[in-house]
Structures are given as C-alpha cells and as structure tokens.
C-alpha cells in the first residue's frame, strides 16, 4: 500500500471508528473491527498506478478481486476475505435502494464523509482534528479528485461515473468539511 493509500486508510479508519462508536456501537466486535481495518487498508488498492493500468475494470471491482486473492493466500477465513472484497467492490456503490453488509455500510459512510464531507453530523470536529493530527491529509482531496479523473479518462465506463462524471471529482476536490485540514503535512 502506497503512502497516499495509507493516509486514506488511516483517515477512513479513524473517522469510521468514530461513526461506529457513535451510531452503531453494537456492531463492534473483535472480528468486525479487524475486518473493517482490513477493508480500510485495502479499499483503494485498485487506484495504485500499477493496478489502475492493469485492467479495463473499474478500480473498485479490480481491487475487490485483488483483495480476495491476497486475503485468501494469506490464510484469512473465507468469510472475512469475501466480506472485505464485497465492501471494496461496493464502497462507492452509493444509493438509497437495496441492502449492504455492515462492513460495506460503514466503509461507505466513512469514505463519503472523508471524500465529500457528507454526513458531517456523524463525527465531531474534535475527532476530525485528532484524526488529521495523527494522519495528515497531505492534500488528499486534490489527489483523489485527480485519481478519479485519471480513471475516468482511461475508462470512460468506470463505475465512479455513476456518481457524476464531473460532480464527483469536483465534490471531492471542493470538500468544504475537510478543507481546513487538507494541507496538513
């Protein structure tokens, strides 16, 4: 995992843990927390330079396949490997119709919070400050907006286009909630 992806894993992990504690404390078990940690660590693996060019598939789908193979090869329980892979595949599959696993729901909430500033009421300002102090954003919004545009340029059919070919990268780049901390190093 690159430094850039590590930053994202840490910020999504930190804000996701806060959302879990505030909104869904009954979900937290040792197994759930470990599976969520793996999901945070690996959810953007499909966006690395190597992986984004390795396939015609959208980064979420290719990333899910990579994650499934890696976790199985490392001896993870199949249920955990499949749960993480499904969450990686669906972490940007936003909508208000249908169902999703708890891990999938939490990674969606945390990534849309971190990338777009959505659902700002789920995480206290002090918690955001603690997370970005421990894990500086290092201009994450501009970086990820560029990654979305790069994938959409390479793959005009990419799954992220369902969030708006221009609306999504512009929303990430213009994330007002995280703007005060986006330049932290």
Name each region found by the language model.
Residues 51, 58-59, 102, 108:
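Short leucine-rich amphipathic alpha-helices used at interfaces
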Residues 77, 81-82:
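Membrane-interface starts of transmembrane alpha-helices
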Residues 12-13, 58-74:
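An active-site-proximal "capping" alpha-helix that borders the catalytic cofactor pocket
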Residues 3, 10, 14-30, 76, ...:
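Divalent metal-dependent phosphate-bond-processing catalytic cores, especially two-metal-ion Mg2+/Mn2+ enzymes
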Residues 54, 75-76:
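Short acidic, glycine/proline-enriched loop segments that cap or flank alpha-helices
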Residues 31-53, 59, 63, 67, ...:
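His-Asp-centered metal-binding catalytic motifs of divalent-metal-dependent phosphohydrolases/nucleases
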Residues 1-9, 46-51:
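Active-site flanking loop/helix segments enriched in acidic
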């Amino acid at each position: 995992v690159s430094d850039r992806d590590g930053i994202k894993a840490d910020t999504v992990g930190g804000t996701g843990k806060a959302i879990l504690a505030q909104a869904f404390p009954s979900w937290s078990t040792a197994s759930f927390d470990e599976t969520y940690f793996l999901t945070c660590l690996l959810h953007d693996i499909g966006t690395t330079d190597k992986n984004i060019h390795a396939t015609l598939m959208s980064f979420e789908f290719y990333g899910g396949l990579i994650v499934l193979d890696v976790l199985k090869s490392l001896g993870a329980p199949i249920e955990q490997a499949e749960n993480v892979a499904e969450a990686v595949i669906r972490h940007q599959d936003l909508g208000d119709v249908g169902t999703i696993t708890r891990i999938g729901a939490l990674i969606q909430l945390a990534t849309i919070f971190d990338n777009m500033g959505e659902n700002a009421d789920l995480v206290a300002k002090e918690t955001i400050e603690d997370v970005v102090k421990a894990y500086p954003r290092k201009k994450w919004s501009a970086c990820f907006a560029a990654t979305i545009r790069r994938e959409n340029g390479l793959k005009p059919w990419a799954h992220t286009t369902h969030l708006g070919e221009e609306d999504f990268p512009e929303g990430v780049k213009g994330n007002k909630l995280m703007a005060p901390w986006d330049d932290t190093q």
